[in-house]
Amino acid sequence: MSRYRGPRVRIIRRLGTLPGLTNKTSKLKSSSINQSTSNKKISQYRIRLEEKQKLRFHYGITERQLLNYVRIARKAKGSTGEVLLQLLEMRSDNVIFRLGMAPTIPGARQLVNHRHILVNDCIVDIPSYRCKPQDFITIKNQPKSETMISKNIELYQKSKVPNHLTYSSLEKKGLVNQILDRESIGLKINELLVVEYYSRQA
């Protein structure tokens, strides 16, 4: 299944607020589940499916990519669900988004694809590049890159940068301090349901 490129508001009406996908909010929110099913009993499969879809659309990844991340998480030490979230959160496009350098993850992905971003002084043009603790993220030394990202920071870095990251406006540099903990996830999600959804596939 390819990456979603359709109307974003339609998705958040069904699944609720997904800050990585869009900074818009839906008046209907995820209560649409209750409205659409009225008195019908919601199947456990559907609940798991919708949690999985939240992850897919929030992080802007394909079905195959998400399945691969689940497989990697299963082989790692610790809670599969927590490791899965850590893998997704440490993607370069998500780190740029969480630093406030882009309004959404698709916006951050575009910055990476267009080679505006450096990690440890090297251009990174792969959105799935996995950042590590002590990696530092800077802007390409070109007026276009600096102007664009400075504008984004001014407009979108409203909420506090999560504890596992630091951004210096003076140096125009972001730093990955550590692997994030569960409380720092910027999404309301039950990752265990996602792991259960893939239990027969991963």
Swiss-Prot record:
Pfam family, one: Ribosomal_S4
Organism domain of life: Eukaryota
Residues covered by the S4 RNA-binding domain: 90-158
PROSITE patterns in the cross-refs: S4
Annotated Gene Ontology cellular component terms: chloroplast; small ribosomal subunit
Listed GO MF terms: rRNA binding; structural constituent of ribosome
Keywords, in A-Z order: Chloroplast, Plastid, Ribonucleoprotein, Ribosomal protein, RNA-binding, rRNA-binding
Subcellular location, principal: plastid
Family: Belongs to the universal ribosomal protein uS4 family.
Assembly and interaction partners: Part of the 30S ribosomal subunit. Contacts protein S5. The interaction surface between S4 and S5 is involved in control of translational fidelity.
NCBIfam families the UniProt entry points to: PRK05327.1 (NF003717), rpsD_bact (TIGR01017)
Reported function: One of the primary rRNA binding proteins, it binds directly to 16S rRNA where it nucleates assembly of the body of the 30S subunit. With S5 and S12 plays an important role in translational accuracy.
Protein's name according to its UniProt entry: Small ribosomal subunit protein uS4c
Source species: Anthoceros punctatus
Lineage summary: Eukaryota, Viridiplantae, Streptophyta, Embryophyta, Anthocerotophyta
